[in-house]
Amino acid sequence: MRIFSFCFLFIILTLSLFFISKVRAGEGASSNYFPGTYGDYAVAVPPNPGLTYINYNLFYSGDVDQAVLQGRVETDIDTFVYVNMSALIYTFENSIFGGSFATAAFIPISYVDLEADLIGELASSRVNDSETGLGDLILMPFSGYWNTGNFYFNLYELITIPTGEYDIENNVNLGHNYWSFDTVLAITYFNLESGREFSFVPGFMINTENKDTDYRTGSQFHLDAMFNQFFSENFAMGLHGYYFKQVTGDSGSGAVLGDFKGESIGIGPSLLWTPKVGKWYPTITANWLHDLDATNQLKGDYVVLTLVWQIGKIGK
């Protein structure tokens, strides 16, 4: 069914959004986790073999009372982020350990606008700056899929590479200047007869130190959950939510606000549409996620518009 062919891809698509985020606790009240983007529709259902191209547009607007940015304390922070992402995912045809296997790479082009009060030694000043360019790349070296009956499981590892521009003298940076390693398990229950689907996606992220600022963001637990109803193979609606908690404090001489642990929760609606375009069935989704509560991090709204185009087997 086309539900299987396309919907499962959104776990890979949406998890890719996390690494360009400027919106979690830690240095800059930010993290390489992007809330609510580790799942969409039938997130753990295995993909068809072959190549898939993904393009999406991400919009985020939020604010936070204070944070450490580029080694400086800033207050009354407002930010807007737009990202256009291109990604290629390849799913292997041969079974591995009784399941299917995929690998992927993601390239973001980002725009970030920041307004904040910069706290100096003698006085404070209001800054307003923006930047456009390449963000931090992400690799997914492995993603394994297994299923039994109506239950599906997806285990994968995400590696964020600090390729985005970073300069401690800048007011705005497109990269975080540290590596992140995120281990994630997605679990889906999908009843094809009723079209009803539940998914849960817990993950645990470990971050390295930003050596330019001597700031290490603490380890983070995140959980995404979604309930979806398919009305046909071409249309579905869902209610999605997330929970985020930083489990170890920030550290290093640059962590002048202490451990700065963050915690947040959010919820919002989602739509999926799979039109027929010639012989192709591209999938389009629209998601809105609103932060209900946030501590030590930006609080705001996320809108994500995505397009998934399954190319298929190479040479076929």
What are these regions (language model features)?
Residues 19-25:
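Sec/Tat signal peptide C-region and signal peptidase I cleavage site
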Residues 29, 33, 211-316:
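Outer membrane beta-barrel transmembrane domains
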Residues 43, 55, 86-90, 139-144, ...:
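Residues on the lipid-exposed face of transmembrane beta-strands in outer-membrane beta-barrel proteins
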Residues 53-55, 99-107, 153-157, 181, ...:
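Transmembrane beta-strands of outer-membrane beta-barrel proteins
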Residues 108-217, 258-260, 312:
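Outer-membrane pore/translocation modules
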